[in-house]
């Protein structure tokens, strides 16, 4: 047997294996980076539903003196297509206690049949999309002439 041929074949095989292994490593090696830039973006996710509150004076006329009948003064529409359990209407400022107030400080109690009164605010457990309430002056109330204002905050709750 020729020793030169025997030694040459395994050596050639080893060289081929090393060379092909090196090629495989070169294919998986990280490329040389010539440019880079960090990236970032912001995406806003809007809250579900469409919360809306409309509060305005009713169109009927109120005449000063003792009222013969319940008389509408304000109308409130609260709506939200999102999931909720109910609503609070909290009188604020000079209207705390549930009154409309004139510039000279005259106070007249407001009432509504659509909401319940609890200590310092009106509320309703109603998860429907739209809730309306009319606030009125009670029959028998004495009302002086002037402009009256009601201030409050509407809260929507889920629990």
Curated annotation (Swiss-Prot):
Subcellular location: Fimbrium
InterPro entries: Fimbrial_Virulence_Factor, MyfA_PsaA
Chain coiled-coil ranges: none
Protein role: Major pilus subunit. Expressed only in pathogenic serotypes, it is part of myf, a probable virulence factor.
Main location: other
Annotated Pfam families: PsaS
Record note on quaternary structure: Forms a homomer composed of subunits assembled in a large structure resistant to proteases and chaotropic agents.
NCBIfam families reported in the protein's UniProt record: Myr_Ysa_major
Gene that encodes it: myfA
Record's protein name: Fimbrial protein MyfA
Entry's Gene Ontology cellular component terms: pilus
Organism of provenance: Yersinia enterocolitica
Keywords noted in UniProt: Fimbrium, Signal, Virulence
Signal peptide region: 1-29
């Amino acid at each position: 047997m020729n020793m030169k041929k025997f030694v040459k074949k395994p050596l050639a095989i080893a060289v081929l294996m090393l060379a092909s292994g090196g090629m495989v490593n070169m294919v998986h090696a990280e490329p040389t980076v010539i440019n880079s830039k960090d990236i970032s973006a912001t995406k806003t996710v809007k809250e579900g539903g469409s919360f809306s509150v409309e509060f305005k004076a009713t169109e009927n006329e109120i005449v000063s003196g003792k009222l013969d009948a319940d008389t509408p003064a304000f109308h409130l529409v609260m709506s939200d297509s999102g999931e909720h359990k109910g609503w609070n209407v909290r009188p604020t400022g000079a209207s705390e206690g549930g009154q409309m107030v004139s510039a000279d400080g005259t106070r007249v109690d407001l009432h509504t049949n659509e909401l319940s009164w609890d200590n310092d605010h009106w509320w309703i457990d109603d998860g429907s999309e739209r809730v309306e309430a009319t606030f009125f002056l009670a029959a028998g109330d004495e009302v002086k002439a002037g402009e009256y204002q009601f201030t409050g905050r509407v809260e929507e709750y889920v629990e």
